[in-house]
């Protein structure tokens, strides 16, 4: 079964989506990620989606669900690298991604997570 790698960096999980997302892969990512949050006890999740050129309503809902589930499991989520076409599509589909924090780059996303968790923006492991 195809899976998206989930890496741990400091007190964060980093997910870099480098393949075209389909429904089954999105569901697997949701399950894998929530399980890793519980297993590791991390406080932040960064999802990098710059390779995604197309996002449909299901994938948009999954991203929203991941952020909501992460919050329930005491971890903040930031989605980074969203392409303009993806943002336009999400708005046209009526998906506001309520509660999903975004940033333009991985660096800005990590800084946002560190700030929201009260950590130094230049903390190094």
Q: Locations of the language-model features?
A:
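Non-catalytic signal-transmission and effector/linker regions of two-component phosphorelay proteins
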Residues: 1-8, 118-125
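STAS-typified acidic loop motif
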Residues: 2-30
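Short, contiguous, helix-prone interaction/anchoring segments in small proteins
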Residues: 21, 31-35, 45
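Expand to "…catalyze enediolate/carbanion chemistry for C-C bond making/breaking, isomerization
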Residues: 26-33, 39, 74, 107
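Extended mid-to-C-terminal alpha-helical interaction segments
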Residues: 31-37, 56, 62
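Catalytic cores of nucleotide-enabled group-transfer and carboxylate-activating enzymes in metabolic
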Residues: 37, 66, 111-116, 123
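Amphipathic alpha-helical interaction surfaces in cytosolic regulatory modules
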Residues: 42-43, 47-96
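Short acidic-hydrophobic, aromatic-tinged amphipathic segments that line or gate anion-handling sites
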Residues: 99-109
